[in-house]
Amino acid sequence: MSRRTRLIAALDTASRSTAQDWADSLKNDVDAIKLGLEFTYACGLDAVKTVSAGHELFLDLKLHDIPHTVASGLTALAPLRPALTTIHASGGSEMIARSREALESAFPADTKRPKLLAVTVLTSMNAEGLLDIGVNATPQEQVLRLGKLAISAGADGLVCSAHEIAPLRDALGDEPVLVVPGIRPAGSASDDQKRIMTPGQAAQAGADWIVVGRPITKAADPVLAARAIMEELASA
């Protein structure tokens, strides 16, 4: 299956003006922007709406609570009209199913519903980190377990590292949307990410979207950094 891997710029900041500057400067050079916990908690939902205007929005709040609370939270977030939004797969099948129902209720059939993405294993986690929280499995084993559960419960796709793309495609096929953080261009610092790949490697593996933050936003010229990644994706 031929797919174009698209680029999400992660605007991870607590500053509304900084996020707005990044969003404005990157408008023609990325496919979407990500606003997550740091920005949303610091600046509020009105700021999310303003900064994301003119962009496809990946609203990455990773909701994880009892099913009713998560479903209600997604209903409250619906006016932001994100293209993609996240919950934790470890919340279980009922939470995922109720989340899907909430989005379908908030977005009638003739409107574009946000894609519901289930976060599997954070890209900062490795086998040792999983064992610390009582999971005696490799990251790949846990991603596959949670990925199968999430898709069967109604998630549209998954957030996973690039290392799990191939086994997920083998297990679940081409339909689930795979969004891949932990992307670092060659020569970039890995920071707190442990399971990383380059943009080109992730595209070749079959990612639908890649998420890149600090290699863009902390670059001397964020626009040039984003363009270089887009060129790498196009040639992958």
Curated annotation (Swiss-Prot):
The active site is at 62 (proton donor). SUPFAM superfamilies: Ribulose-phoshate binding barrel. It is an enzyme of class 4 (lyase). Its EC number is 4.1.1.23. Gene3D superfamilies: Aldolase class I. GO terms for biological process: 'de novo' pyrimidine nucleobase biosynthetic process; 'de novo' UMP biosynthetic process. Transmembrane segments: none annotated. The keyword Zinc-finger does not apply. One of its GO terms (molecular function) is orotidine-5'-phosphate decarboxylase activity. CDD domains: OMP_decarboxylase_like (cd04725). SMART domains: OMPdecase. Substrate binds at residues 12, 34, 60-69, 123, 184, 193, 213-214. Belongs to the OMP decarboxylase family. Type 1 subfamily. This is Orotidine 5'-phosphate decarboxylase. It comes from Gluconobacter oxydans (strain 621H).
